[in-house]
Amino acid sequence: MQPSSPNATNYLADNIQISSANLSQTEMVVGRDSADYTAMHSINVGVGNSFLRGDTDIPQESGHSFETPSNMSFTAGQWDTESLPPVDTPDALNKAAGRIRSLLRRMDHETVAYEDMQRNLHYAARVLEAVFIDESREGCNGNCKNLNCSRHSHGRDDQQQDNNNSNRSCSLQEASPGGAGAGVTPGADNQDSIESRTKGVSQAPQTHSGPTGPPSNTSSETIAQPAPKLQPALETVRESVMEESPSKDPGDKGPPPPASTSTLTSQTTTSSSATAEPSAKAAESQAGSAGSSGSCSNPAAVHRQRRLRTPTWARSMSTNKTRLADEDDELSEVQPDAVPPEVREWLASTFTRQMATSRRKSDEKPKFRSVAHAIRAGIFVDRMYRRVSSSALTAFPPDVVRLLKNLDDWTFDVFALTEAASGQVVKYVAYELFNRYGSIHKFKIAPGILEAFLHRVEEGYCRYRNPYHNNLHAVDVMQTIHYCLCNTGLMNWLTDLEIFASLLAALLHDYEHTGTTNNFHVMSGSETALLYNDRAVLENHHASASFRLLREDEYNILSHLSREEFRELRGLVIEMVLGTDMTNHFQQMKAMRQLLTLQEATIDKQKVLSLVLHCCDISHPAKQWGVHHRWTMLLLEEFFRQGDLEKELGLPFSPLCDRNNTLVAESQICFIDFIVEPSMGVMSDMLELILAPIAPMNKSKPATLVEHETTANSTTNSAIVIPNSGITPSMDKPRDHRTEAKTTAAECLARKSVTGTTASKFNIPKPWLTCLVENKRIWKEQAVKDAEARALATAAEEAAAAAAAEAEESKPETETADGEQSEPAAEPADGAAA
């Protein structure tokens, strides 16, 4: 399903302006650069304010004034990102924050077009990537060589004052010595600090391709002879500036800055005249300074303009003393639980690498004044991405949402789901599970590509219209492996990539199944059997067809994986899919039992996940009776169709494929006794062995619970593998029910002797035990009834055959009697004739 098309009513205007009346708060202008954007509402955002509205995990301050549906006025064209400033400019963060904040609020009312959401999120992500910090917590003594230091902006000695004057104006602009800098108070300087820094950037062309480049009107001659007092400060930029060549006459002036960079809200302009007048004068003075920057002969001004290309939040903004709070105070505003692990790792790796190249040797530990803001931005983008990815596919039907709440249960009914989902079960269940485990976000799967991929997978499963091996079976196996990952704790033993591979393998393990067995392909000499040399014919086809589908760009959900990640995922998926070949069942069980008997067994993850998927593939007899019986009837119907085809081709019937000669109940009892129950037992022991070291020790259970578990285990016929011992009950034939209690007691004693008390052993939930017992009981009752019915049918057939035989025997006797009666009558006639 496609998202709704963009229209003027689907969007929320981010008409937010930040009032600069309060100097203790961050000065930002968040809004559109259009002439129609005049009537705006004000909102005061402090340092600690979050980007998110209504979030309880991020502290928020009062003063927010969000738009209501009545004042939402946005056209579809205004969501374009072409009008936004470059990602490395000072106001890029504010613009991106306003954009995404508006998107978030709009999503609370109506849907937003996916294309607009994608463009704005991409812009916000690039803004975050442009962030880098060049400060440390170490204080400045007023004599450092860093021109970015706040004390250089407000120095009190003559040298510092001259630096201030040279940084704020060019040599062609006349200024009284010592007067300009001394007359500016810290408050006034802070009021126009962002505006003054924006002036230099606004002259460069605004693109999204990265830095706007250094000023092209700076002459190399000017840089060659810097002022002596600025010589130490400009050593770091001399080499890069010398490489530039003049492209303009020094007398030319650059274009005036856009009005958007100095636009103030109506609320700001109508504040107090005493505040507005100095601001206007400062803005005028800075406009003149920026206008004459093209003819600037002062190297400090060149250095200043080069610094303006650095994002505002990445430089020192400590001119306002209220913003010189400790970094720990800023970070304390963000709770650790509010930061997703992937965002935290990204922040740590990114900021650490960039700071390592910019900090001085004397710094012992880098301190980041803007980490808190970056974390908040990262949290916001992360949540927005999750919301977009979860709403990219159209909303799930209410009945589907209700049924998906039981997705974590062993008794999940996929047949009820397919009725509510109109047959599109792969689309809803696969998307739900990928989203629950975070695979969509972690591996950057585009929602549109994921939707197309799931649609093709569903088509592949429905291609041959199989009664059993169809999209329902794929979803059933995928939900079962989800239960094993989630409820047993197996997911804690795996990486994100391995979890994603497990879900993907379960989804694709029978992709494009033909509805026939491997033996049928071999016996009939099909093209698939010839292609794969009669070995795991269908399983090889499932894996090959799946990766052939993933190779197409419009269905490739693995496009953002690295080469190593793709190789690992492909190997794991292929191994798991090939492990579903039933011809390898007993060999697989034997190998795992041998590993479990070792004292210090090292079990490969591929073998573990292959066994888990294999058990999930044959697990329907371990589900509740209603689901299991329905699956059994569907599987037998598929077998019978193969038998009909074999009859047409003149091939012998495969087992259980003859409609007229199949013992359904007996076959299911044997399947449970010899295949399913031993497999589930081995899987349980394997999971308990590998998960025990990473799971907390279970507390001592109540005696009634232990007794209940012992009773439940005693009613099963599973071949239990005892860890760290060689005791394995025989699988040659089902155990006699008369000796079942004795055998179970012996197994319990053996367990206690090897593993100690029951309370100290790590146990996983085994809801299949009761289902297996119940299903076997019902099948046995059904077998008795079937035997009686067959006996009656046999008796009836025998009676009918006897009756037919008697009828055949009585018929010749009647003919003989008639012949004897006709002979005496003929004799008198002969005598009369004589």
Swiss-Prot record:
It catalyses: a nucleoside 3',5'-cyclic phosphate + H2O = a nucleoside 5'-phosphate + H(+); 3',5'-cyclic GMP + H2O = GMP + H(+); 3',5'-cyclic AMP + H2O = AMP + H(+). Residues 207-222, 260-301, 823-834 have a biased composition (Low complexity). The keyword Lipid metabolism does not apply. It comes from the Eukaryota. The keyword Iron does not apply. Type I PDE are activated by the binding of calmodulin in the presence of Ca(2+). Inhibited by zaprinast and sildenafil. Binds 2 divalent metal cations per subunit. Site 1 may preferentially bind zinc ions. Residues 236-252, 732-741 have a biased composition (Basic and acidic residues). Mg(2+) binds at residue 510. It is an enzyme of class 3 (hydrolase). Residues 364-387 are annotated as: Calmodulin-binding. Cyclic nucleotide phosphodiesterase with a dual specificity for the second messengers cAMP and cGMP, which are key regulators of many important physiological processes. Required for male fertility and male mating behavior. Belongs to the cyclic nucleotide phosphodiesterase family. PDE1 subfamily. This is Dual specificity calcium/calmodulin-dependent 3',5'-cyclic nucleotide phosphodiesterase 1. It comes from Drosophila melanogaster.
